[in-house]
Amino acid sequence: ENGKTFKVSDKVTVENVRYDNRFGITVAADMYLPKGLDTTKKYPAIVIGTPYGGVKEQGAGIYAMVLAERGFVTLAFDESYNGESGGEPRHVSSPDIFVEDFSASVDFIGTRPFVDRERIGAIGLCGAGGFAVTAAQVDKRIKAVATASMYDISRADHYGWKDSMTKDEY
């Protein structure tokens, strides 16, 4: 259904959106809204990063949909260089840019008039878990963070798989 790997709930509406991060890369996202959203009220929001190599039409979209059913405004996004987002070469890994994608997502969702800017959280799935935690450390607008099956790519890059590198090696 619309390229998604799951059936979209009839309790939400989905809008495909685009916005740029501070590196000038266009980020593609799906914004999920509770059906019947009252635009005169303020709702908590959550931005959701995909597993490394995944796309918003998979796991991140499922999280976004279920949380929107529960009253959150959610944004499942494709990290730069992946999915429908921009960036060349494709499928490259860039922790600093992936962290910025979380902040750019907060920028975008925070400009929606129905979002409570004091109640924005982030979820990172798998590899995006480390990026979500780092984004929450540097972007104080992110008031809560959660991960699922987190893998810290930055730590693995520095210290080796399961911290296997000695100090002389790094």
Where are the predicted features?
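N-terminal cap/lid segment of alpha/beta-hydrolase-fold proteins
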Residues: 2-41
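Glycine-rich "HGGG/HGxG" loop immediately N-terminal to the catalytic nucleophile
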Residues: 58, 81-93
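Alpha/beta-hydrolase active-site loop
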Residues: 59, 92-113
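Structural cue for short, hydrophobic secondary-structure segments
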Residues: 48-51, 76
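Primarily recognizes the serine-hydrolase "nucleophile elbow" in alpha/beta-hydrolase
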Residues: 104-170
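The serine-hydrolase catalytic nucleophile loop
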Residues: 53-65, 79
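Conserved alpha/beta-hydrolase
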Residues: 66-86
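Active-site glycine-rich loops that stabilize anionic/oxyanionic intermediates
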Residues: 22, 43, 50-55, 126
